[in-house]
Amino acid sequence: MSLPQDLLYSKEHEWVKQEDGKLRIGITDFAQDELGDIVFVELPEIGEELKVDDPFGSVESVKTVSELYAPVSGKVVEINDDLEDSPEYVNESPYEKAWMIVIEPSDEKELEELLSAENYEAFIQD
């Protein structure tokens, strides 16, 4: 299982990458592996305001549909349109090609609630 050390993680299995005051968000390798083959991804509209733990979309696999939850509050400023035509990217490249949204955070202190790679690894092994 791939677990980049430079990212932050939520207990809902989203990853967060800090980039120039914005946050790029996707689901973890662990999450995509648990879901199986992804066949559809639903994402929010650009401009949508999210609060921490709000559902912001869903991923549908051959097994189930799973909600996506905002790891931090903020405004959606970019979505990954490639996932509409290529949902399999979530399985193939969860940390690169399959990022889902970029948000401008409204409260950066919420980042302190997220897990380091080491703590996320311990969380998923429990």
UniProtKB/Swiss-Prot annotation:
The modification N6-lipoyllysine is found at residue 63. The gene is gcvH. This is Glycine cleavage system H protein. Pfam families: GCV_H (PF01597). Binds 1 lipoyl cofactor covalently. One of its GO terms (biological process) is glycine decarboxylation via glycine cleavage system. The lineage of its organism: Bacteria, Bacillati, Bacillota, Bacilli, Bacillales. Its cofactor is (R)-lipoate. It comes from the Bacteria. HAMAP family: GcvH (MF_00272). The keyword Signal does not apply. The glycine cleavage system is composed of four proteins: P, T, L and H. Keywords: Lipoyl. PANTHER family: GLYCINE CLEAVAGE SYSTEM H PROTEIN, GLYCINE CLEAVAGE SYSTEM H PROTEIN-RELATED.
